[in-house]
């Protein structure tokens, strides 16, 4: 995918957003020589950005557990663990965008499960209804959600909480569980990976095969 897709048309409207290097060893922006070094350097870049702008001015770090726009990039081992520690140290919320990775795409229910990290907030859409009806939402830990019990605020749209969307989501979740589709995505993803690796051996122009479950690049 193109990293600028969906972003450049709206700049500079989303102001006060700071971007950090992608934890992508194959094309590491920081010249890392190993996956472990890439994880360390890109996580360090997150901490450096927080310190440069001041922890009090940084509300959240937002990322996909496995990057979809870059073509199924799975961060090197240790990256998300380190980012979680950094966010906790400076009081920064960790937000996972699970619109693509949620509800079985990676062979786990959520990308958070795949990388073994609990975010403070998780956004989701698409997969909750398998695309049959437009539904999206957010899930938050008690640390975040309990604040709104004390100081609620109105944040909704005309068609928020449409009953047809709720019905579609519940029916879809039932099918995902009944037909074991999450584990099926894991098994089919393993098969796809093997085929892609075979193709890589046959075609020198293919430099990298990556991804998880049925999100591959």
Q: What does each of the following model-derived ranges do?
A:
Residues 1-217:
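Conserved N-terminal phosphate-binding loop of PLP-dependent enzymes in the Aspartate aminotransferase
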